Every structure is written in C-alpha cells, then in structure tokens.
C-alpha cells in the first residue's frame, strides 16, 4: 500500500480546531492516515475537557515511513507548549508554538514528499502581523511555491478561489 498520509497543523491552540478535529477523525470517508502536529499537553487537556476518549500514538522520527502510523489512533508529532487551561484567550503568546508547528510541518513535507496538508486556523493579527495577506501566502513563501490555491470545502460544495487573500482592487490584475 502506498504511504500517503494527511499532515495537519493544529494552528492556534486556543481555537475550536481540535474540537472539530476530534469530531472528524472517525469519519469513514477518510482513507489516508492522519498525522497531527500539535502539543500533547494541549491535546490531553482539550480531550479531557471535551470528554474525548481516543488513544494517542506519538511519532518521534521525522522520516514518517519509519514510524508506525495507525488509523484508529491520533498520530501525533508533539510540539512543546504548556498551557495551564484547555482554552485560553487568543493572544500573541502562542505565536512561537504556531511557528514551531509550521517549521516542523514544512521540514516533514519536504523530507517525506507529503502531498496532503491541512492547517488549522491562525490569527492573522497576532501571528502573521501584517507580513502576509493570509496563511496561504505564508505557506507558499515558506515552501517556495509560486502558484498556490486555497480550497474551501464542506459536504455541499468545494470552492477554490481564483485569487488568494488579495485586496479587491488588485484582483483584476492577478487573473489576467
């Protein structure tokens, strides 16, 4: 069987992303193993608060093929972050953690030739700090990708906008 995992960066630790993740991991439509990059401590705190009972498989080797990956467990690459509570107010305190998660993800994507990547939400004001229009541009720059697309997906519809985060006055120039 071809090794083709989905790599997920949880993003802002104080968002609802992990709650959504916990609800989606048992979806039968997901055929590929999922590998989550997040904090084990945060994961355990939020699992306890949300009463989620799922085993966690810690992945230690960045060469993913050398690890056991399970479909029935949360495959986690731990990034150090020490919250005191499961949910706190969103602030710039989590920027270093988010940055470390993305750096690790980019390294793993390059090393393992990962083709499926999902990122959780981030706060543009605190994390991107006006250096990038959005997370799509941040990821593109870090991975040195010139042509990118966002995919917005739900049960009813999948949409890929013609442009990414772009002020309206520049849209016409970008699509010509």
Model regions and ranges:
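Anion-binding alpha/beta catalytic cores of soluble intermediary-metabolism enzymes, centered on
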Residues: 1-176
